[in-house]
Amino acid sequence: MNTKGKIAGIISNLVIVEVDGPVSQNEICYIKTSDVKLMAEVIRIGGKNAYIQVFESTRGLKTGVEVEFTGHMLEATLGPGILSKNFDGLQHDLDKMEGIFLKKGDYTPALEDDKIWVFKPLANPGDEVIAGSWLGEVKENWIPHKIMVPFNFKGI
């Protein structure tokens, strides 16, 4: 079960959250408002409080609002299709956004899940692989993207 918390204080885009369990430095969390989820990152921990930086406007937030921690750090998604995109610092696809400013709570996936890519295997059935081993490759235009065993891979 993920750690949860409630907003105890707000100073601009710094939000103080009283947490009910463990959180980590740089962990991602979401503030759940009535209509959107706002992404934030833990920048400091002190006692039962996590100090989080919200990546967009905190206007309208109130104390007592629920915050859910993901257990994950801020991560970049890598894979075929990424080189032809325009991203901001949180890997929002700016070409899919409408208008000059991002809508509050609006997020786009970094990669298109429904796009089909031709996979060329580099590993053979029965090969022993470890985290980081190349399994195959996928070409995006003329650039081959190596597909690797995930770094959190455990087991056979």
Sequence positions of predicted segments:
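Peripheral, non-AAA+ core regions of ATP-driven protein-machinery
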Residues: 1-156
